């Protein structure tokens, strides 16, 4: 079981709602992923109606919505989006995203920390999307964030675990859940993140952009489960040298000396 912001979930795979070709494929993929938490960009909600037809099927599945502030360029804009999400969706949960660079979508660490501290004071359950920076993640934890979401590689890139060395440090030090976010492009990469000890992963593009999103969602679900079980089982230690699994040493030492001579060539 996975505990996040005082809620318990059976799935450790979070999914997104963007980039799918249609809403039917999106919903079927989410169901196949067994995910219980889905992210939702505020820009996808109709401000006049207060809702969008994307919400109805998601809520009907009993999913926990995690609105994000994607598109915010600074702390002020992110806080505005957070208040809007709280009013429209009646939730204090928030994925905090601040990326002023539209090309690479790198999160702004300074604005993110400023916004996170203020939002935590306002009662939000903040899950910040950040660089895989152990120092920043610790600071975010100190200001009250419910979890940290360090990136594996640039968002939407499918490049995989480019920040693995730093993710390991964050996982080792964190006292809040670590959700590896952004850039995971294959089920094997999600499995590896879980093997490292991540509490959960968030996947969107790798599922939505695949040839068969519904099947791919199921693959990610299975990979996350396998990775978590492998972590709990304890991976074998990597050795710098070879090691026999079934050495013959003891058996050969018991053989009579005359039987150990070199065989004569024919």
UniProtKB/Swiss-Prot annotation:
EC numbers on record: 2.8.1.10
GO biological process: thiamine diphosphate biosynthetic process
MF (Gene Ontology): thiazole synthase activity
Gene3D superfamilies: Aldolase class I
Subcellular location(s) per record: Cytoplasm
Protein name: Thiazole synthase
Enzyme class: transferase
Positions with a binding annotation for 1-deoxy-D-xylulose 5-phosphate: 156, 182-183, 204-205
Record function comment: Catalyzes the rearrangement of 1-deoxy-D-xylulose 5-phosphate (DXP) to produce the thiazole phosphate moiety of thiamine. Sulfur is provided by the thiocarboxylate moiety of the carrier protein ThiS. In vitro, sulfur can be provided by H(2)S.
Pfam families assigned: ThiG (PF05690)
A single Gene Ontology CC term: cytoplasm
Stored SUPFAM superfamilies: ThiG-like (SSF110399)
Keyword Cytoplasm attached: yes
Top-level taxon of origin: Bacteria
Catalytic residues as annotated in Swiss-Prot or TrEMBL: 95
Stored PANTHER family: THIAZOLE SYNTHASE
This protein's pathway: Cofactor biosynthesis; thiamine diphosphate biosynthesis
